[in-house]
Amino acid sequence: MNKLKTGLYIVSTPIGNLEDITLRAKKVLSLVDYIVCENPNHSLKLLNKLGIKKKLFALHDYNEKKLIKNIENYQKNSSIALISDAGSPLISDPGFNLLQDYIKKNIFITVVPGPSSVIAGLQLAG
């Protein structure tokens, strides 16, 4: 398998049905070195379904600054995915300070888009 470029991969996850994961999200999650997530137990349901085993770092509003310090050595030569419990990370989720840290250090950042509850709601509204 290919190694991903060092950086932060902001990966959207399914918002209801685990099978709504995109092919690109599955590929990125399988190739990153580490995954930062809100709730490891919740994230493991998706990762186990996909057959992906990675070291997980739990991210919450109360531990975000400490987490940034803890992963500082990994940032320099690792690919790290940021995922939320459902949907797009950073939308009502922790991770803003982590993203700002990557921006400040000029480390590669990319987004892997996925399902959108806003679009789904508009579609259902007719």
Regions found by a protein language model. Give the residues of each.
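Glycine-rich, flexible N-terminal cofactor/catalytic loop recognition
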Residues: 1-62
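Catalytic-core regions built around general acid/base machinery
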Residues: 25-31, 70, 74, 98-105
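Short phosphate-engaging motifs
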Residues: 42-43, 67, 117
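Glycine-rich, highly charged phosphate/nucleotide-binding loops
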Residues: 62-71
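Short glycine-cluster motifs
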Residues: 76-126
